[in-house]
Amino acid sequence: MSKYAAAPSPYSHQPQTPEHKSKTLVVGLTGGIGSGKSAASDWFAQQGIDIIDADVIAHEVVVKGSSTLRKIQRKFGDWVLNANGDMDRAAVRTHVFTYPDALIELEAITHPAIREAAKKQLAESTSPYVVLSAPLLIEAAEAGLANLCQRILVMDATENTQLARASQRDALSVQKIEAIMVNQLSREERNRHADDVVLNESDLAALYVQLEPLHQDYLKLAQQLKFAAD
């Protein structure tokens, strides 16, 4: 897979419209549960790279009193709120798991808000390039986050490694982890949409050895993009 040519993908993460034509290189970071996304994200942050975390944004856009939470309440009813006026995440999670169409309706509300918040953070970034971390960057094509990225970096790990890490880190049952994995792309499918793949099967030191040359490549690409935009 070419270091500098994007891999063909039906999810098309190449810039499509003027709003994506930024002088800042955006690297989309994704991977299955337990693949090491957080470890990679932390390492890039230690190198001075700004991190846009879609999971964090997803929580921020539905805080108590937010316009997004009010839209969810109007769509589904008052039961989406707990006694404190916060979103009852457990109730909402159970509802969308039981009624798949409800998940589509929920994401139609949350995805635009997440995308706009990500774009705002991108516009405010001052680092040489930006890492946009999103577990479902490829799967959730309708969210449009992948279209903000010029590169897709996939953290890869075997299913056994994913299960071991996730069960140790999150104290989840094997059944729960497997249920999460079912809703994510397979390793093979995810890797087909990647520009860069890091096989994370060992310790942090081994991971960092793989990330360093990618970081240097991204710095060079960021410079090329900046000069091309000037």
From Swiss-Prot:
Q: Give the enzyme class.
A: transferase
In this protein, which residues make up the domain named DPCK? 26-225
List where in the cell it is found: Cytoplasm
Enzyme Commission number: 2.7.1.24
Q: Which UniProt keywords apply?
A: ATP-binding, Coenzyme A biosynthesis, Cytoplasm, Kinase, Nucleotide-binding, Transferase
What this protein is reported to do is described as: Catalyzes the phosphorylation of the 3'-hydroxyl group of dephosphocoenzyme A to form coenzyme A.
What species is given as this protein's source? Answer: Psychrobacter cryohalolentis (strain ATCC BAA-1226 / DSM 17306 / VKM B-2378 / K5)
User: Would you tell me the protein name for this molecule?
Assistant: Dephospho-CoA kinase
- Keyword check for Mitochondrion, yes or no: no
Molecular function (Gene Ontology), one example: dephospho-CoA kinase activity
